[in-house]
A protein has these predicted regions:
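Catalytic domains of carbohydrate-active enzymes, especially glycoside hydrolases
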Residues: 1-7, 27-32, 72-78
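Active-site-proximal, glycine-rich beta->alpha crossover segments in alpha/beta enzymes
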Residues: 63-131
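Acidic/histidine-rich catalytic cores of soluble enzymes
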Residues: 112-179
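Hydrophobic faces of well-ordered beta-strands that scaffold small-molecule active sites
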Residues: 1-4, 35-40, 78-80, 147-149, ...
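Active-site-proximal loop/turn and secondary-structure-junction residues that shape catalytic pockets
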Residues: 8, 41-43, 82-86, 151-157, ...
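Surface-exposed, active-site-proximal loop segments in enzymatic domains
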Residues: 8-16, 42-60, 86-98, 111-120
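Glycine-rich anion/phosphate-binding loops
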Residues: 12-23, 50-68, 125-132
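Acidic (Asp/Glu)-rich catalytic clusters
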Residues: 15-39, 68-72, 103, 138-144, ...
């Protein structure tokens, strides 16, 4: 089984179309494998949803289309994240055998500037997520697609002025209780 993280699919109009998703699935199947999941769409497909921006409702409509198209293309799982400022890393670290590994050093990362227009509160981010979940979950159920959410990476409280919600088991429990 194959999972693609943010596949390079044309995002005309801020959404993925059915034909491109079917082509991707068929391409994987040509090699005797199964495309089981897509993890993440480009952040600019849903950043206004995460931050309650002026294009939130437009992006929700586009994401509804995208989720429907993923399901209708025969891809059973869609994973996403709630990190509008992406995964954070600091310079790589040398590990056993002299290999280099990705790293995050909070002493460095916590000093980085704001990534968006202002600081956001954790409750704002939860309210935005709740709004999204109550809309997208019934769509996913209707289409027979499963949703997954990526943990905050790194799992620290806040980076660049944006709270990182999924850093604990309690956060996942809170998510499940929304819908």
């Amino acid at each position: 089984d194959i999972l693609f993280n943010t596949p390079l699919i044309s995002g005309d109009g801020g959404k993925w179309n059915l034909q491109d998703l079917v082509k991707l699935r068929l391409r994987v199947e040509q090699f005797g494998m199964k495309l089981t999941a897509l993890e993440n769409v480009p952040t600019n497909f849903y950043d206004h949803i995460m931050l309650n921006g002026p294009r939130r409702d437009e992006q929700i409509e586009n994401m509804i289309s995208t989720v429907r198209n993923i399901a209708r293309a025969g891809i059973p799982i869609f994973g996403y994240n709630w990190m509008p400022s992406h995964v954070w890393r600091t310079p790589p670290k040398s590990i056993r055998g002299g290999a280099l590994a990705t790293a995050y050093d909070h002493a460095l990362g916590s000093k980085y500037p704001l990534t968006h227009d202002r600081e956001y509160s954790e409750e704002e981010m939860w309210a935005n997520l709740e709004y999204w979940i109550k809309i997208i979950t019934p769509i996913a159920e209707e289409e027979g697609i499963r949703l997954g959410i990526h943990p905050s990476d790194p799992p620290v409280p806040i980076l660049g002025g944006i709270p990182r919600l999924f850093r604990s088991f309690a956060a996942y429990k809170r998510l499940i209780e929304i819908y």
